């Protein structure tokens, strides 16, 4: 058995988990998430915990059991506490502001960049150079943050661009004559 899958997923109070065959639905204060578990993995619910077990005695099934446990844990954490990713804008004139369901970015292009906020995600701009992406689905939060960063990734000479708040950009030295 996978070392990750051995540990059960604790379901906190206020979070409701429904198992229907291979379909798992997790509902909590921050939202609702659904996912279909692979056929090689069995999920059991007992005593406020979710237990994951591989159906086959195969390396891939054991690996899938560990992955399933991690994804279920992310679902439970997401609907109870939520996930967030912080981005910061570095550069002269680089700005961000939220208008309704759109994120408006000024990133030094000849045109402003409008990013429509997907369903299940909330985007805040506490200041003009900060963006906070929040949501219940960890994968979707990371994907949206990566899409925003991709508009203008940090360049290696001055570090201008959109970067994650915890990202370290290693700067190159300019060419010398």
Swiss-Prot record:
One of its GO terms (biological process) is cytoplasmic translation. It comes from Alkalilimnicola ehrlichii (strain ATCC BAA-1101 / DSM 17681 / MLHE-1). This protein binds to the 23S rRNA, and is important in its secondary structure. It is located near the subunit interface in the base of the L7/L12 stalk, and near the tRNA binding site of the peptidyltransferase center. Belongs to the universal ribosomal protein uL6 family. GO terms for molecular function: rRNA binding; structural constituent of ribosome. The keyword Ribonucleoprotein applies. One of its GO terms (cellular component) is cytosolic large ribosomal subunit. Part of the 50S ribosomal subunit. This is Large ribosomal subunit protein uL6. It comes from the Bacteria. Keywords: Ribonucleoprotein, Ribosomal protein, RNA-binding, rRNA-binding.
